[in-house]
């Protein structure tokens, strides 16, 4: 199931750097993290759903690349983001 518009707007409001910000790295990573967590729950119930598993891996790779970009360009923003999202990195 895709992320609802209300939930996405809630995440955007929480992680936006300024009003109208929908494309910053923080917002993209936060939305991807929600989607990854949601897909993880689905995969736990439906272990043989390989198409969803592949989509999950693509989202994880996209988030990894965005986090690497943020870490390379602004370490402080990177640390704040991983702490607020509760990521293990």
UniProtKB/Swiss-Prot annotation:
SUPFAM superfamilies: S15/NS1 RNA-binding domain (SSF47060)
Name the UniProt record assigns to this protein: Small ribosomal subunit protein uS15
InterPro entries: Ribosomal_uS15, Ribosomal_uS15_bac-type, uS15_NS1_RNA-bd_sf
Cellular component terms per the entry's GO annotation: cytosolic small ribosomal subunit
Pfam families named among the record's database cross-references: Ribosomal_S15
Organism, scientific name: Streptococcus pneumoniae serotype 2 (strain D39 / NCTC 7466)
Complex and partners: Part of the 30S ribosomal subunit. Forms a bridge to the 50S subunit in the 70S ribosome, contacting the 23S rRNA.
Family under the similarity heading: Belongs to the universal ribosomal protein uS15 family.
Task performed by this protein: One of the primary rRNA binding proteins, it binds directly to 16S rRNA where it helps nucleate assembly of the platform of the 30S subunit by binding and bridging several RNA helices of the 16S rRNA.
Gene: rpsO
Record GO biological process: translation
Keyword RNA-binding: yes
Lineage: superkingdom: Bacteria
PANTHER family named among the record's database cross-references: RIBOSOMAL PROTEIN S15, BACTERIAL AND ORGANELLAR, SMALL RIBOSOMAL SUBUNIT PROTEIN US15M
Keywords assigned by UniProt, alphabetized: Ribonucleoprotein, Ribosomal protein, RNA-binding, rRNA-binding
């Amino acid at each position: 199931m895709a992320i609802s518009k209300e939930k996405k707007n809630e995440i955007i409001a929480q992680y936006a750097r300024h009003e109208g910000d929908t494309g910053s790295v923080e917002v993209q990573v936060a939305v991807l993290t929600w989607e990854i967590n949601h897909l993880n729950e689905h995969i736990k119930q439906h272990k043989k759903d390989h198409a969803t598993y592949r989509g999950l891996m693509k989202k994880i790779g996209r988030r990894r690349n965005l986090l690497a970009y943020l870490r390379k360009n602004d370490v402080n923003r990177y640390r704040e983001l991983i702490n607020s999202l509760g990521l293990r990195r």
